[in-house]
Every structure is written in structure tokens, then in C-alpha cells.
Amino acid sequence: MSSGHPSDNEEPRADLLREEEEEEEEEEDSDEDRGSTRPASPQATRECAGTQGSSRPEVTADGGTGSASGSGCRGSGACDSLFSWICRRKIRRGPYVDPARDHFRTMTRLYSSMSPAADSVNLSTQTHGAVFNLEYSPDGSVLTVACEQTEVLLFDPVSSRHIKTLVEAHEDCVNNIRFLDNRLFATCSDDTTIALWDLRKLNSKVCSLHGHASWVKNIEYDTHTRLLVTSGFDGNVITWDTNRFTEDGCPHKKFFHTRYLMRMRLTPDCSKMLISTSSGYLLILHDLDLTQSLEVGSYRILRARRPPLSTEGSSAGSRSGGPRHTIDNKNHPHREGLSPRNSLEVLTPEIPGERDRGNCITSLQLHPKGWATLLRCSSNMDDQEWTCVYEFQEGAPPRPPVSPRCSLRLTHYIEEANVGRGYIKELCFSPDGRLICSPYGYGVRLLAFDENCAELVDCMPVRTAQLREVRSIYSHSDVVLTSKFSPTHCQFASGCLSGRVALYQPHF
């Protein structure tokens, strides 16, 4: 003990007092709010008493023990700060315990090293035709391939082993595949039908669904209501009640209709439906209720409301999001009593370099956390293509104040290779939403929001920014039409016009 203590018989009591004070410091450190400035501990407050007015206070005497050096105070503060950080991590508070944040540097290195696997799947052009769509099962155990020549192929994506070929799965091109769960999946085709399949019994369809009058291009699934949702070039969005399907089909009804329909998607929480059109419009149904059919032909009452022009350049223009169409209840009083469910918003998304020219939204995807939408657009002259990311300005994590007039804001974009005209290129998000895989000529590009592959909410630009290229891989001999990330493995796949499917894995 130091000479400052009156006698040796008081040493145990002094030790107990110090231990109690240290325990109180630990409790206060563990209870502090995440992200706030850590308040000084009681001991530090006493040590720094009388010097609060100084920007860098020195430690004063404490209990007659004599003055300590300023470096001692700073060292104690550093130790306290380190202890507080460890304590917060231990009790799983703060951003330090998010696995995605902990491992994003590792994932960046992994995806930067992606290369075609030596045992990629090669398909015969004469037998299968072009690859139009790829889809993994939710558990990542099966990769399905939608082919031009009426067939669906199933592979083990880890070993590239062929599992099954669904010969004549349809009578025309197979356009899209969607898993309802780990065993049941649906396919759609230009033969205007949808087919349900069970992985446990692939010798025959579970059932065929008839209801569309033209090519069926898109399948979605509402996990809450177990409704299958399909869209086609007949302009119809149809819901199918899979709770009551039989060998003859299942009950269905027409939910929505619009002209020039290209793609339809549901947000991950199924609270919104997004529909893209070949005329450049993007339709958003908010507060979605799939059990209520919308009136066909009632959308002539929509009128355009263009936001005021801004003088802040492209940044402000991107915040406005372009023209917005809303229901004019003053001119149509019978619409005032409408339920707020399924409220419709019609947007003309801003496309870089295409302010005065039309465009076609050919591909549509949603961020896995519902924060943004991903569009592949082409000019009306079909001489330019872009990949664009639009942030949802409602329901997303808090961002700096933006214009409330539009629910989408262009945040990132990049120009694409203008090859394979007339074919739709399907792009996709990675499961964590940090990367985009985009068909690019005879290969694919991995794109990120910044050089660190950060999450969108962590690198939201004030002005519209270009997507960063993480890696380009050219492994096909023809135009790539589709790409897909595995939901469980560090792997993605791409398919091209000549019928080849390539698998990509990290190469060390």
C-alpha cells in the first residue's frame, strides 16, 4: 500500500471500496446507449474535478494520494474505452456484432477472386436452346435451368452433377422458375401456362394452371397467404390459391391489368407490388392486399404530376425520381371512399442520359431487405442499356431528408454493353444485398455500391453515383442472358444464348 493510507489495518477496507467502485464502473459502461458518447465514470469524475473548464483536464489529487500525471488519465480513459467496447461486444450490442459487418472484408476478397468452376455445366444448343432463367432452391441444394426448347434441367450446384431433365415441361419456351419452398416449384412458359412440380416426384407435374391469354413471363409467391402471383404479356396479373390446388389446377382470379407489362415483383415482406412496362413506367401498389381484385380499366383517371425542376443538377433531379402519377379524387369523387389498401403510384424512373427520350424497363429485381429496386433499362432506340438502383424513400432505414413527392430515388447507375438486342438480361442481388451480378456482353460483372462492398444504407450518396465494378468475368462464347446468386454458398451462375451455364466460385 502507498504511504498515503493512515495504517495497515485499513488496507482490506480500502481494497473492498476500490473493488466496489470498479464494479459500479463496469455496470455503468455496460448500460450506456449504443452510439452515444460514453459518460465519465465516477472515479474519473472525481479525478478530473476542478479542471472541467479545460479542454484537456489534468488529473488532480484523489483522497490525499498525491497528484497523478496527465498521461495516466489518458491511459485510464483508453483502458476504459477498450473495456467498454469489449463489454458491448460481449453482450451483443452495437454494430460490432453484426456478422455481415464483421465479415464484409472477407466476402469482398472472396467475390473478387471468383472464377469459373472447372466443372461448369455445358448444355447442348441443339437440344436445349438458350438459357432464359436460373433459380436456386431456398436451401441451395438444387439449381434449376429454364431453357428455350421447352425443357427444365436440374443440377447439384456443388458437384455440377445432373439430377434430372424435365423433357417437354412445356410446349414452348420456359421463361421463369420460382420455388415456393424447398420441394415445390413453379415454371411458366410462352405456351400461356404455369406448371407446379415437386422435387420428390419429378416424373409428372403436380398440376397445370390455365388463365393467361399470352406468354407468361414472371412468377412470384406470397408466403403469408400462399398465393402464387403470375404476370404475362397479356397485361394481366393473376393470383392462384395454392392452398386448394388439385390435379386440375387451383382457384384463380385476375388481380390487376395494365398495358405493356414486362415484369412484376413483390417486395420481400409482400407489402408492395412493382410492375415495369415497356413504355418506361414503373407501377407501385402500396399496402398490398392480394385478396382484393382491382378494377380493370379504371386507371384512365390517373394524371401526371411532374415535380418542379431543381437547380441543384443531377443530384436534385435524382431525388425527385421523375414524373409521378396520382389519383385525382377531386375530379373523381367516387374514388374518395377507397380503402388505402392497394393504393397505386405510377412513376417514370429517371434514366441517366435519357431525360428527353423514352426507355423500356426490361428487368426488375428487389433488394433482399426491401431497401431498393434494381432495374435494367434500354433506350427506345435500343442502342443503350443501363443498370439503375432506386432507393425506397419510405420503409427504408432513416436517410437524410429528401423530397417526399416520390417514393423512389435514383442512387446508383452504370451503363451496360449494348449487345444481344431484343433479349432480356436478368440481373440479381447477392443474398446480403451488397453485390449485383449483371450480364455484360459475353460475361458478367460484379457491381458494388462502393469500393468496400458496403451495404447500401452505409454508403448512400448525396448525389447519384456510379456503381463500382468489383470483377468482370468473361467465360461464355455468346451473349449472357441471366445470372443468379446461390442463397447459401459463395457461388453464382450465369446462362447464355448458346445454352451454356457457368458456375463461379472463389479461386485461391
UniProtKB/Swiss-Prot annotation:
Domain of life: Eukaryota
Biased composition (Acidic residues): 18-32
Coiled coil residues, start to end: none
Keyword Disulfide bond among record annotations: no
Comp. bias (Basic and acidic residues): 7-17, 325-338
Biased composition (Gly residues): 63-75
Renumbered ranges of WD repeats: 126-165, 169-207, 211-250, 256-295, 356-396, 419-457, 475-508
One cellular component (GO) term of this entry: Cul4-RING E3 ubiquitin ligase complex
Start and end residues of each stretch annotated as Disordered: 1-75, 307-343
GO BP of this protein: protein ubiquitination
SUPFAM superfamilies from the UniProt entry: WD40 repeat-like
InterPro entries from the UniProt entry: DCA10 (IPR039085), WD40/YVTN_repeat-like_dom_sf (IPR015943), WD40_repeat_dom_sf (IPR036322), WD40_rpt (IPR001680)
Keyword annotations of the record: Repeat, Ubl conjugation pathway, WD repeat
Pathway: Protein modification; protein ubiquitination
Protein function: May function as a substrate receptor for CUL4-DDB1 E3 ubiquitin-protein ligase complex.
Record-stated family: Belongs to the WD repeat DCAF10 family.
Protein name (record): DDB1- and CUL4-associated factor 10
Lineage: Eukaryota, Metazoa, Chordata, Craniata, Vertebrata
